[in-house]
Regions:
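Membrane-water interface at transmembrane helix exits
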Residues: 16-20, 42, 58, 83, ...
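Structural motif marking the loop-to-transmembrane transition
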Residues: 3-8, 25, 29, 45, ...
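Short helix-perturbing small/polar motifs within transmembrane alpha-helices
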Residues: 8-17, 59-62, 74-120, 130
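Helix-coil boundary and interhelical linker segments in multi-pass alpha-helical membrane proteins
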Residues: 1-7, 37-48, 82-102, 166, ...
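Helix-loop-helix junctions within the multi-pass membrane cores of secondary transporters/permeases
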Residues: 93-181, 186, 190
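Alpha-helical transmembrane anchor segments
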Residues: 188-200
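Hydrophobic transmembrane alpha-helices
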Residues: 1-69, 73
């Protein structure tokens, strides 16, 4: 992958992280995030297939009360990077789907860290508001939103730092029973996600 493609992938990851809280342009949705990553890396078709499958899973995820849903943005971005770096094309989609689920759950840890840091930003906004500083309030708002973007951009950059040959070797070294199991499990998770939406 070229340096320009890597930079563009990190930008997509940053936008996906910000959109996780802004919800304006939907960059955090798996279908959009994976498609954009596929577009900038030249792997459009496999990434659209991956994004569509992950979207079916994420449709059933929702924040309810204090319970936070798994991180769809991190799952989409990280699994798309693994798919592209693995170089397996459409054949690697099922493995990428299976990898996305634990990544989504792991993303909750990063979400909690960033939301805790955002509390500091809120206190700074309050202090700026007490002084009548509109620019101060605006600056702290931007910082808080950028923290959400960094939450996805840093793991994306870390994955891109791993040589594609190492990712491909790791994926190719998996035994057939494991890849077949991941393929079946990935398909079941998509079906369960869609079934949850139908039941709503």
């Amino acid at each position: 992958m070229s340096v320009i493609s890597m930079v563009l992938v990190v930008i997509v990851a940053f936008l996906a992280g910000m959109e996780g809280v802004l919800d304006e342009f939907q960059f955090h949705q798996p279908l959009v995030a994976c498609t954009l990553i596929g577009l900038v890396t030249g792997q459009l078709v496999p990434c659209i297939i991956l994004g569509g499958s992950l979207q079916m899973i994420a449709l059933g995820w929702a924040n309810i009360g204090a319970a936070v849903a798994p991180d769809a943005a991190l799952a989409a971005v990280a699994s798309a990077i693994i798919l592209v770096q693995g170089g397996q094309g459409r054949a690697g989609v099922d493995t990428a789907i299976a990898v996305a689920i634990p990544l989504a759950v792991a993303g909750l840890f990063l979400t909690m860290i960033v939301r805790t840091l955002s509390v500091i930003c809120v206190h700074q906004m309050d202090a700026a508001a007490a002084k009548g500083s509109f620019k101060g309030v605006e600056a702290w708002h931007i910082i808080a939103v950028c923290l959400q973007g960094i939450r996805i951009a840093i793991p994306a950059a870390a994955l891109l730092a791993i040589p594609s040959s190492a990712v491909a070797a790791a994926l190719n070294s998996m035994p057939a029973w494991l890849t077949d199991g991941m393929s079946i499990g990935g398909g079941m998770v998509v079906a369960v996600g869609y079934a949850m939406v139908i039941n709503m």
